[in-house]
Amino acid sequence: MVWGLFPVDPLSGEDKYYIFSKGIYKVGRKGCDIIINKDKGVSRIHAELTFDATTVSTSRRNKSSSDTSSFVIRVKDCSKYGTFVKTDLGTKDKVHELSNKEKILQDGDVIAFGTGSAIYRLSLIPLVFYLCPSSETFKVDQPVQDAVSSIGARISPTLSEECTHVLLEPRMQVNEALINAILAKKTIILTNWVMLLAEKSICSEIPGYSQYRPSVMVEEALVDVLELNVREKCLEGFTFVLEPTDTYRFGCSFPSLLEVCGAETVTIEDISSMSQDSQFGEINRMICVIPKSAGDKFGRFKHLSLLSRVNEMDLVCAVFSGNLPSTSLIPPSVVISSSCSTDETVVADSEAEEEETTSSVHMIDATEKAETPEKPAAIVIEDSPVTILEETSNLNEFKSVNLLADTESRGHMDEKNSSDSVTIRRDRNDEAETGKSEIIYTQDLIVRDLRSTRKVQSTGGEGVVDFKRFRKGNVTCGNSFSSLIPFAKDPYKEYDSWDVTDFMKEEKKRKQMEAIAEDLFKTEKARKRGTAGSIRGFLSGS
């Protein structure tokens, strides 16, 4: 057992003391094991506390239990102003008046040192450890047993209510015993923590658990076990939809394991009968738990199709680590209806890469159709370097369109040739000012370059359309002048070069006349100034 000496007044500023091993501890001023600064009447060495191992239990709280590792505690007065002990029975003894100036202390006794300002309570801190077995043949190591006995603690063979800590070995595989420790809300630490206590005799605080968190194996994943206060609220706000408990690895303990962490559980039968405005919360907070052994069978229920899913073992990892990452959640499946598919592909205007700078297509009219569907027809614009073949109902028959920009006449249809093709002529003014054309491609449209020996096909070996094999038109890409200035094909055409020349001549002549006038003005002004300065000018002026 660990003993504690705590100040009765927590606001006094005095330290707490924890005693882990037997020995003699001095009480007094600076340099002693237990330092008292509040009372000026405390001597340099005021008293001595002696802890001896005994087979007799010193705890009044559990008189029926016999503990082989308890202590007998005695206080001896060595001061001038005395040491006083007040028991739970109400008696107050002056230690310096007793025989040998000693008194045996028990759990709950109040000790006053000096004039009575420094008052402490002796308290028993029970430490009962349960070593979680990693296998059926697990045995406690002898060094661990010795460390537990040296601090006055003991090891419980089973996980009971009196157990204060659960000790684990590093990288232990998760089993039923560990799940029961989580359900019992016990502090889970490594066995090294007990070894640390055994090395100490007295300290002002019990060592923390942060550096002694165990790591457990959940199948192949290594998970750190966090503190109880972190685990108990890690799943708060979630409602988990469960299959029958026998389909999960930990059986009936699995729903309780989730509830210990703040979550709610509901079975498939319960959620089938409840309404949308149920007490289980919003639908986006409900998650279906997929058993590892049975797999995902929630798809057979239509009302569960919009719920996210999580694997059973991922949820077990969240219970130990105190965190359910969003990456562990499996989003619901989205059904895409057949109406999303299209029969035609429309290619909007885009900046196509220039394949050949020597050729350009000013306009493509792909909306023309053949007059007779039975016989393939073609629309030809003379001397075109590009041919577009459009597949008809028969995969072996194609419609051919030859393109060329005619700059001489207005667009119209003038004749039909012997091959049932139609020649279309269009004027340059009819084309779009941007210099680009709108082309509507159907599903089976093929673009071919007649000057290139390489064949470009839009269908694969199985008749599947391959849109990536289209060749882009010869349109200037980037910030071309026609794109930036669409309102003027020839920006200098609207200015008359002769008018500009005449204007420049007149402007030059005007500046010359101004310069001459300025020179004459300055000359006349200088002459008058010289005349006025002379005596002759002054006399002639008078």
Curated annotation (Swiss-Prot):
Residues 409-430 are annotated as: Disordered. One of its GO terms (biological process) is reciprocal meiotic recombination. It comes from the Eukaryota. Disruption phenotype: Hypersensitivity to the DNA cross-linking reagent mitomycin C. Residues 25-90 form the FHA domain. Residues 465-500 are annotated as: Involved in MRE11-binding. Residues 119-195 form the BRCT domain. Pfam families: FHA. Induction: By X-rays. Its main location: nucleus. It is found in: Nucleus; Chromosome. Coiled coil: none annotated. Component of the MRN complex, which plays a central role in double-strand break (DSB) repair, DNA recombination, maintenance of telomere integrity and meiosis. The MRN complex is involved in the repair of DNA double-strand breaks (DSBs) via homologous recombination (HR), an error-free mechanism which primarily occurs during S and G2 phases. The complex (1) mediates the end resection of damaged DNA, which generates proper single-stranded DNA, a key initial steps in HR, and is (2) required for the recruitment of other repair factors and efficient activation of ATM and ATR upon DNA damage. Component of the MRN complex composed of two heterodimers RAD50 and MRE11 associated with a single NBS1. The FHA and BRCT domains are likely to have a crucial role for both binding to histone H2AFX and for relocalization of MRE11/RAD50 complex to the vicinity of DNA damage. Belongs to the Nibrin family. This is Nibrin homolog. It comes from Arabidopsis thaliana.
